[in-house]
C-alpha cells in the first residue's frame, strides 16, 4: 500500500536548483497566503534545497523584496 503523500511528492533528480533572492515570483510560489514558508513535505524539495530556499526567502524579506506577512494579516 503506497502512501498518498509519497505519490504526490515532486522529485527533483539531476536538476540544479538555485533560488535567487531577487526572483520575487519564484519565491512567492513557496510562501502561503499568510506569508509562511511552505514545508518540505508539501514542496517536495530535498533538505538541502529547502535550506537554500529558506535562506533566500529570509534574505529577500530582509531586503524588503517580499513582505514578512501578507497585507490582510497586518
UniProtKB/Swiss-Prot annotation:
The protein's superkingdom reads Bacteria
Sorted keywords for this record are:
Ribonucleoprotein, Ribosomal protein, RNA-binding, rRNA-binding
Record carries keyword rRNA-binding: yes
Q: Provide the GO MF annotations for this entry.
A: small ribosomal subunit rRNA binding; structural constituent of ribosome
Instruction: Work out whether the entry's keyword set contains Flavoprotein.
Output: no
Give the UniProt record's GO annotations in the biological process aspect.
Answer: translation
The record's annotation in InterPro entries points to: Ribosomal_bS18, Ribosomal_bS18_sf
Q: Could you name the Gene Ontology cellular component terms for this entry? A: cytosolic small ribosomal subunit
Q: How does it assemble?
A: Part of the 30S ribosomal subunit. Forms a tight heterodimer with protein bS6.
Q: What does this protein do?
A: Binds as a heterodimer with protein bS6 to the central domain of the 16S rRNA, where it helps stabilize the platform of the 30S subunit.
State the similarity comment: Belongs to the bacterial ribosomal protein bS18 family.
Name listed for the protein in its UniProt record: Small ribosomal subunit protein bS18
Question: What species was this sequence derived from?
Answer: Chlorobaculum tepidum (strain ATCC 49652 / DSM 12025 / NBRC 103806 / TLS) (Chlorobium tepidum)
Q: Which gene encodes it?
A: rpsR
Amino acid at each position: 500500500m503506497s502512501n498518498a503523500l509519497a505519490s504526490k511528492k515532486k522529485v527533483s533528480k539531476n536538476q540544479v536548483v538555485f533560488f535567487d533572492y531577487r526572483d520575487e515570483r519564484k519565491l512567492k510560489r513557496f510562501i502561503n497566503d499568510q506569508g509562511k514558508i511552505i514545508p518540505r513535505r508539501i514542496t517536495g524539495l530535498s533538505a538541502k534545497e529547502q535550506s537554500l530556499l529558506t535562506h533566500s526567502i529570509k534574505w529577500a524579506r530582509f531586503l524588503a523584496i517580499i513582505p514578512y506577512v501578507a497585507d490582510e494579516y497586518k
